[in-house]
Amino acid sequence: MTTFLGNPVTFTGKQLQVGDTAHDFSLTATDLSKKTLADFAGKKKVLSIIPSIDTGVCSTQTRRFNQELSDLDNTVVITVSVDLPFAQGKWCAAEGIENAVMLSDYFDHSFGRDYAVLINEWHLLARAVLVLDENNTVTYAEYVDNINTEPDYDAAIAAVKSL
């Protein structure tokens, strides 16, 4: 059972599992452009999904994945939340993280529904990490049961490095 702030929460949809093909998406970048999964074609992808960049755990998760994986060839870390693109951009500027890919699902929550991470009770995204290979096949999936805790960074990073 997944919990948020100590309370059980529900989701719509089916969580992706290892071996599944990732769903396409259309999300808003910090410059208000639309980004799709196809924009990252041919790259290994880490989808770092968070409730809000304005929380300590989400900030730590975003910073850590960007620091530890930014030097890997042909790899992109994509952080997804329902924060407004302006808030995501402001966070990147304040943290001095210039090349982070921050995408927002604020507009219609379609990513949250398609990836089964939209918390029905709060309309925030749950914490999850998905690693996709160059063909968008899920090679690692972690949906964090207690959304207030950090993901297993070591396992996710090892999954990316093994590709």
Curated annotation (Swiss-Prot):
User: Which Pfam families does the UniProt entry name for this protein?
Assistant: Redoxin
Write out the catalysed reaction: a hydroperoxide + [thioredoxin]-dithiol = an alcohol + [thioredoxin]-disulfide + H2O
What is the uppermost EC class here?
Answer: oxidoreductase
Sorted alphabetically, which CDD domains does this protein's record hold? PRX_Atyp2cys
Q: Which UniProt keywords apply?
A: Antioxidant, Disulfide bond, Oxidoreductase, Peroxidase, Redox-active center
Quote the PROSITE patterns the UniProt record gives. THIOREDOXIN_2 (PS51352), TPX (PS01265)
Gene Ontology MF, one: thioredoxin peroxidase activity
Instruction: Identify the residues that the record assigns to the Thioredoxin domain, covering every copy.
Output: 16-162
In short, the EC number is 1.11.1.24
Q: What else is known?
A: The active site is a conserved redox-active cysteine residue, the peroxidatic cysteine (C(P)), which makes the nucleophilic attack on the peroxide substrate. The peroxide oxidizes the C(P)-SH to cysteine sulfenic acid (C(P)-SOH), which then reacts with another cysteine residue, the resolving cysteine (C(R)), to form a disulfide bridge. The disulfide is subsequently reduced by an appropriate electron donor to complete the catalytic cycle. In this atypical 2-Cys peroxiredoxin, C(R) is present in the same subunit to form an intramolecular disulfide.
NCBIfam families, per database record: PRK00522.1 (NF001808)
Family, as annotated? Belongs to the peroxiredoxin family. Tpx subfamily.
Q: What does the protein in this record do?
A: Thiol-specific peroxidase that catalyzes the reduction of hydrogen peroxide and organic hydroperoxides to water and alcohols, respectively. Plays a role in cell protection against oxidative stress by detoxifying peroxides.
UniProt protein name: Thiol peroxidase
Name the gene.
tpx
